[in-house]
């Protein structure tokens, strides 16, 4: 029966699919995320010690002591965490200011309520340190007893005592550092005493003891020192502890950084404890009991080590504060002020890189075969192959530990040695101590070195994590094989000799070892083995088959004892249960065989042959790392842990409450991340996510080790802020990079070459590795999976929109000449968008542009509006047209005020052309377009406005022309017609050109002297002329753009050019071949075959429109002229009907006569310092007059009856040159001739368009027939 699923449920199920992580090819440039699977801890802390019934009883008892001491160490660590993470509560509690304060009881009660649990913890801490000191001293006393001094003490036991010494040093330093602990206890004590909470003497005494304990510095150390000195021979045991630490440190018998630093701290603090009233370390050194010169070398090499968190300790301080230092100062070199080369991380980078490359190469070889090919777990390998993988895993962990320790040691040294304004000029004198220790204490090279090492650590952690299952199998196989080979084969010979020589103690130890770890082939030890009887093997040899299993040592269950149970047959994590107990037992028993102390007169070592001793020592040394490697997952995490780079509780304590938390500028993870972003170093850009992983380390440590939620909350808050800043800066950088790339690509190559010739280099943006970052779809940070590409895409989309908006705003803040620059800004943004779309999903550029242009739903956008605004308020009234250059230039004398424009906002260079050099280069290029408006500008207007925008601008211009022609100009025409002479005949040639000039000057005196003629009248006509010219030039530019479009569209419409043919070739054959070649490009048949009906209709309409546009030759200027003609309906333009019924000859009632008068006026030459009409108004003035004349149909009359033309004809005949009425005749004639040529050009252009209109409007020619003229004599006769 099928289950019914609703549509809502189905849709919700589909939505859930988006949450499924899909595998992708994202480049790995971040550390591994924490596994969501649990990490089992199988450390039983020797709880299974009683299961090892075959072991030596003394060492089982010692394991019991180990167990209890480990528990105490864990408790001590908890108190160390408590002290380190202590934040002052008393500062947050209101203080009682006087005894008369009414709410003081309530304040004290709340104080006690809040602080009592914390003070209880402090009381427990005081009791714990007493108990720990007593326990440590009791162990020392037991081991230093006269009868036990020669007894064997295992290395594990000595190291556990060393860990106690380290614990005391840490706890004492933490107690000294935390003033807030003392303040909180004082506040509690004050409140409790007021409320009489501590009435009984015992409570008062305990409180007093706690006060003294917290107040006295080094109280734990002093108590420990005092109690140790009363123990006879304690210095001998401490010398053993120090020596084992020296030996371990010298032979690198440690794995994690914390183990390394613990060895050094135990050396220093141990020497301090040894040097006192009872013993003298210098005498012990003289007796060769300890080696101070070796310790001095270690301390000189590594002067500062981490103590706890961000607390550090100078190892030389232990030496300086010891009792006998002053008289032996000369023996120490570590106490001298010198910088160890260990802290110069930049010099160490060569070796680190070399180690990294060498190990990565070897690891890659195994990774390719084990992980990539998928053969790692399935294939069976030899012991040698397993051993190689085992060694590889160990070397990898040691390398990671070495690098992590190096980072922490440099960081610790920097914290102890903060910079100042004298060492670093960038460090202000008011900088805080933590700021001087972090923010200003690292050079750029050191920051890059830190980032590179961290990247190596985290990157190698990823690679080793991928091979963890392969390593686990190899480790278990190798350890199993090593243990079985050693127990079943290597120990046979010493067992045979011991049986033969009847060394009972040696036999018992060897048998205990074999019974503890042997996994016999048949389930039990071969009873016929000759070595058990002390006999030699037969001549053919005794065959011992040592099995091979992929398991580690497991715990022994007392209830089901069998040798095979020592090793869990199923392997896996079960195979690691109790490995610590087993390995402890085996190693301790082996150590007892080769130790110099045995508790008897003769050591067991002397009973063994030299080769056997060497074999045991070698195995004992190798097996040290077995415990770590069996838990490789945890070891890998510890070796890569850099969490302490964030913690700063010590420095917060130093601020005494002035700081709740430090800003991100002082935080090391952000300092390193921000340094990469600020320097834009290409080689470091792929490492930028690794410093952010330090927050993961710190958060993990805060939750799992410190177990403090407030620390995690602070880390989370800083991560939120830092990641926002990271995305913001990275997105801006990526946008700026691709914007600069686009600007460089589009920059004119010849311009770049010319700049280079003059020594000016315009650089290309250096190649950067942003592509890898843009592929990051799931960055892991504090347990969140972040789509970095999506966040950057959001920011870049906003930046892209802002860039387009800024380009348009920049155009809006300038005049019309800047439209060429606007187009190039948009082209650069278009190329930027195309480059970015290769790596991210952005909205289409056209959609972004329409949004920035406010043209999504409006019929026209900001660019169209500003073009019209500039035309109306600046271009029409203030520009002069020059027909020779085909350009408009700004007038010499403006008749209107400069329009007020908004200033462009100051933005970053990448919002313009990409960078400062590119901005300067493009500014120089486009400065050549700044001083005129010509064909480049009109073509740009056509491309940016399109048909719709051009139509809007034209419509608005026609409104302006209409208002001028029917308003201002019409009123002036009416006025000027009134002051014109009623009749002005053209004088006869006999008067001569001077007489004619004088005649016209006299007749037109009122027009010449009209005050507003050369200002308002000419200005209004200039605006009309400029509007007409703008429409004409837009028409021409649009035609060129259309032709370009048509040529581009031709191959897709099957419009092919005629081909050249040779003699004898047929044109049809060549054309058919060409058509066949371009047939796949023919769009309409293609869409008709493959498209939808809607697509077919669109394709056909587009094809038809393109062809019709090509064939019709549509003209917009004709329509403009026709519209302007409709504005000239007032009778004043044409005058009253002529009395002769034909035309006005001498009457000055038509516009062309008025224009003749105006032309006479501006043809009069001006003085030296005066501006001519063409300088003030340009050719637009003539275009306005001639256009009106043509549209009124008065051109021929104007050519016949124009005053200036008549004067020019006469002057050409008589050639006279006189000055009439201060007017040079010859100069005036020259000016008339120039304007005549201009007028003829204008008439020719206008007639070309008007004739087509007239031809289209009427096919019948209207001819008026007149009667022939009749002589007067005949007329009277008739």
Curated annotation (Swiss-Prot):
Q: Which GO terms of the cellular component aspect does the record hold?
A: cytoplasm; cytosol; extracellular exosome; membrane; neuron projection; nucleus; perinuclear region of cytoplasm; SCAR complex
GO terms classed as biological process: apoptotic process; axon guidance; cell morphogenesis; cell projection assembly; cell-cell adhesion; dendrite extension; positive regulation of neurotrophin TRK receptor signaling pathway; positive regulation of proteolysis
Post-translational modification N6-acetyllysine, affected residues? 1062
Q: Tissue specificity, please?
A: Expressed in T-cells. Increased expression is observed in CD4(+) T-lymphocytes from patients with multiple sclerosis (at protein level).
Query: Which InterPro entries does UniProt cross-reference here?
Result: CYRIA/CYRIB_Rac1-bd (IPR009828), Cytoplasmic_FMR1-int (IPR008081)
**GO MF term list:** small GTPase binding
| Chief place where the protein resides | cytoplasm
Source organism's superkingdom? Eukaryota
Instruction: Indicate whether Cytoplasm appears among the record's keywords.
Output: yes
Q: Which UniProt keywords apply?
A: Acetylation, Apoptosis, Cell adhesion, Cytoplasm, Disease variant, Epilepsy, Nucleus, Synapse, Synaptosome
Q: Does the keyword Nucleus apply?
A: yes
Q: Write out the annotated subcellular location.
A: Cytoplasm; Nucleus; Cytoplasm, Perinuclear region; Synapse, Synaptosome
Task: Tell what triggers its expression.
Answer: By p53/TP53.
**What does this chain do?**
Involved in T-cell adhesion and p53/TP53-dependent induction of apoptosis. Does not bind RNA. As component of the WAVE1 complex, required for BDNF-NTRK2 endocytic trafficking and signaling from early endosomes.
The record's family statement is:
Belongs to the CYFIP family.
Clinical condition linked: Developmental and epileptic encephalopathy 65: A form of epileptic encephalopathy, a heterogeneous group of severe early-onset epilepsies characterized by refractory seizures, neurodevelopmental impairment, and poor prognosis. Development is normal prior to seizure onset, after which cognitive and motor delays become apparent. DEE65 is an autosomal dominant form characterized by onset of intractable seizures usually in the first 6 months of life and severe to profound psychomotor developmental delay.
What subunit structure does UniProt give? Component of the WAVE1 complex composed of ABI2, CYFIP2, BRK1, NCKAP1 and WASF1/WAVE1. Interacts with FMR1, FXR1 and FXR2. Interacts with FMR1 isoform 6; the interaction occurs in a RNA-dependent manner. Interacts with RAC1 (activated form) which causes the complex to dissociate, releasing activated WASF1. The complex can also be activated by NCK1. Interacts with SHANK3; the interaction mediates the association of SHANK3 with the WAVE1 complex. Interacts with TMEM108 (via N-terminus); the interaction associates TMEM108 with the WAVE1 complex.
Q: What is this protein called?
A: Cytoplasmic FMR1-interacting protein 2
Q: What is the lineage of its organism?
A: Eukaryota, Metazoa, Chordata, Craniata, Vertebrata
Gene name of the record: CYFIP2
């Amino acid at each position: 029966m099928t289950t019914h699923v609703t549509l809502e449920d189905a849709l919700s199920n589909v939505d859930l699919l988006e949450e499924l992580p899909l595998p992708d090819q994202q480049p790995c440039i971040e550390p591994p995320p924490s596994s969501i699977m649990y990490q089992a801890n199988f450390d039983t802390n020797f709880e299974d010690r009683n299961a090892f019934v075959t072991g030596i009883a003394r060492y089982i008892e010692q394991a019991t002591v180990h167990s209890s001491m480990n528990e105490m160490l864990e408790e001590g660590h908890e108190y160390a965490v408590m002290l380190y993470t202590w934040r002052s509560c008393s500062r947050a509690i209101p203080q009682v200011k006087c005894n008369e304060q009414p709410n003081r009881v309530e304040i004290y009660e709340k104080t006690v309520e809040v602080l009592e649990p914390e003070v209880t913890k402090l009381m427990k801490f005081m009791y714990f340190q007493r108990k720990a000191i007593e326990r440590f001293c009791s162990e020392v006393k037991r081991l230093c007893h006269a009868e036990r001094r020669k007894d064997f003490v295992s290395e594990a036991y000595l190291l556990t005592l060393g860990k106690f010494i380290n614990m005391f040093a840490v706890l004492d330093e933490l107690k000294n550092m935390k003033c807030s602990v003392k303040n909180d206890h004082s506040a509690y004590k004050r409140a409790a005493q007021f409320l009489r909470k501590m009435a009984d003497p015992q409570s008062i005494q305990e409180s007093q003891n706690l006060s003294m304990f917290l107040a006295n510095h080094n109280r734990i150390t002093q108590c420990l020192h005092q109690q140790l000195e009363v123990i006879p021979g304690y210095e001998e045991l401490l010398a053993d502890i120090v020596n084992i630490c020296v030996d371990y440190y010298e032979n690198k018998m440690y794995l994690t950084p914390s183990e390394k630093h613990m060895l050094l701290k135990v050396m220093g603090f141990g020497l301090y404890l040894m040097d006192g009233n009872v013993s003298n370390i210098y005498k012990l050194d003289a007796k060769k009991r300890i080696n101070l010169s070796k310790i001095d070398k270690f301390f000189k090499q590594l002067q500062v080590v981490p103590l706890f968190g961000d607390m550090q300790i100078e190892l030389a301080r232990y030496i300086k504060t010891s009792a006998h230092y002053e008289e032996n100062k000369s023996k120490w070199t570590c106490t001298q002020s010198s910088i160890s080369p260990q802290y110069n991380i930049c010099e160490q980078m060569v070796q680190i890189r070399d180690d990294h490359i060498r190990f990565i190469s070897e690891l890659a070889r195994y990774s390719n075969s084990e992980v990539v090919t998928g053969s790692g777990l399935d294939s069976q390998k030899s012991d040698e192959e397993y051993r190689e993988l085992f060694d590889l895993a160990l070397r990898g962990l040691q390398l990671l530990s070495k690098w992590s320790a190096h980072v922490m040691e440099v960081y610790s040294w920097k914290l102890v040695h903060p910079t100042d304004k004298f060492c670093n000029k960038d460090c202000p004198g008011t900088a805080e101590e933590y700021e001087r220790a972090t923010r200003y204490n690292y050079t750029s090279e050191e920051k890059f070195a830190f980032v590179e090492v961290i990247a190596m650590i985290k990157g190698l952690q990823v690679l080793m994590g991928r091979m963890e299952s392969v390593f686990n199998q190899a480790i278990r196989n190798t350890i199993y094989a090593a243990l079985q080979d050693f127990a079943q084969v290597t120990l046979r010979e010493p067992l045979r000799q011991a049986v033969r020589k009847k060394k009972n103690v040696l036999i018992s130890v060897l048998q205990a070892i074999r019974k503890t770890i042997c996994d016999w082939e048949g389930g039990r030890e071969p009873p016929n083995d000759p070595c058990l009887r002390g006999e030699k093997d037969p001549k053919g040899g005794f065959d011992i088959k040592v099995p091979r299993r992929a398991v580690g040592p497991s715990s022994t269950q007392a209830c089901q004892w069998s040798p095979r149970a020592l090793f869990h047959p199923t392997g896996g994590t079960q195979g690691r249960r109790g490995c610590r107990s087993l390995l402890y037992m085996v190693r301790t028993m082996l150590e007892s065989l080769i130790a110099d102390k045995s508790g008897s007169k003769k050591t067991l070592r002397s009973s063994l042959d030299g080769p056997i001793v060497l074999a045991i020592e070698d195995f004992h040394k190798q097996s040290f790392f077995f415990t770590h490697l069996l838990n490789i997952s945890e070891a890998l995490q510890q070796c890569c842990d850099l969490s302490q780079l964030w913690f700063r509780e010590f420095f917060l304590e130093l601020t005494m409450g002035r700081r709740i938390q430090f800003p991100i500028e002082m935080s090391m993870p952000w300092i390193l991340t921000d340094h990469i972003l600020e320097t834009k170093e290409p080689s470091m850009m792929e490492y930028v996510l690794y410093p952010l992983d330090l927050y993961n380390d710190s958060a993990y440590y805060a939750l799992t080790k410190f177990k403090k939620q407030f620390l995690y909350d602070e880390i989370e808050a800083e991560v939120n802020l830092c990641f926002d800043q990271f995305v913001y800066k990275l997105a801006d950088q990526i946008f700026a990079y691709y914007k600069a790339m686009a600007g460089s690509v589009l920059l004119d190559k010849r311009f770049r070459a010319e700049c280079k010739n003059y020594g000016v280099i315009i650089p290309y943006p250096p190649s950067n590795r942003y592509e890898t970052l843009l592929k990051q779809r799931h960055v892991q940070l504090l347990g969140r999976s972040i789509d970095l590409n999506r966040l950057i895409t959001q920011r870049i989309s906003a930046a892209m929109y802002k860039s387009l908006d800024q380009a348009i705003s920049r155009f809006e803040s300038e005049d019309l000449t800047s439209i060429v620059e606007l187009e190039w800004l948009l082209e650069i943004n278009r190329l930027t968008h195309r480059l970015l779309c290769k790596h991210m999903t952005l909205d289409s550029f056209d959609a972004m542009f329409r949004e920035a242009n406010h043209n999504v739903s409006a019929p026209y956008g900001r660019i169209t509006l500003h073009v019209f605004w500039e035309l109306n308020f600046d271009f029409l009234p203030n520009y002069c047209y020059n027909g020779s250059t085909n350009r408009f230039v700004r007038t010499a004398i403006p008749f209107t005020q400069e329009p007020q424009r908004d200033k462009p906002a100051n933005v970053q260079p990448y919002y313009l052309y990409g960078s400062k050099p590119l901005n300067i280069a493009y500014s120089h290029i486009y400065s050549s377009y700044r001083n005129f408006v010509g064909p480049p500008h009109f073509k740009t207007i056509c491309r940016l406005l399109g048909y719709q925008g051009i139509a809007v601008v034209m419509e608005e211009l026609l409104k302006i022309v209409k208002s001028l022609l029917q308003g201002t100009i019409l009123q002036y025409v009416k006025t000027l017609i009134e002051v014109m002479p009623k009749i002005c005949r053209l004088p006869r040639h006999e008067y001569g050109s001077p007489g004619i000039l004088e005649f016209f000057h006299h007749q037109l005196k009122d027009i010449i002297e009209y005050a507003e003629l050369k200002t308002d009248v000419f200005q209004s006509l200039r605006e009309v002329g400029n509007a007409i010219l703008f429409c004409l030039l837009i028409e021409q530019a649009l035609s060129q753009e259309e032709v370009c479009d048509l040529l581009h569209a031709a191959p897709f419409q099957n419009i092919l050019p005629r081909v050249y043919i040779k003699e004898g070739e047929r044109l049809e054959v060549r054309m058919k071949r060409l058509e066949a070649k371009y047939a796949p490009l023919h769009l309409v048949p293609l869409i008709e075959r493959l498209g939808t009906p809607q697509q077919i209709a669109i394709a056909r309409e587009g094809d038809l429109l393109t062809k019709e546009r090509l064939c019709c030759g549509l003209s917009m200027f004709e329509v403009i002229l026709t519209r302007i003609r409709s504005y000239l309906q007032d009778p004043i333009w044409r005058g009253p009907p002529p009395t002769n019924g034909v035309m006005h000859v001498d009457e000055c009632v038509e516009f062309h006569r008025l224009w003749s008068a105006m032309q006479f006026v501006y043809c009069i030459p001006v003085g030296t310092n005066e501006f001519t009409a063409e300088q003030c108004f340009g050719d637009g003035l003539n275009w306005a007059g001639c256009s009106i004349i043509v549209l009124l149909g008065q051109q021929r009359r104007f050519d016949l009856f124009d005053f200036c033309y008549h004067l020019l004809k006469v002057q050409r005949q008589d050639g006279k040159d006189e000055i009439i009425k201060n007017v040079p005749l010859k100069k005036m004639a020259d000016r008339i001739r120039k304007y005549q040529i201009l007028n003829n050009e204008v008439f020719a252009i206008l007639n070309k368009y008007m004739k087509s209109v007239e031809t289209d409007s009427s096919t019948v020619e209207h001819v008026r027939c007149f009667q022939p003229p009749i002589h007067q004599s005949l007329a009277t006769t008739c």
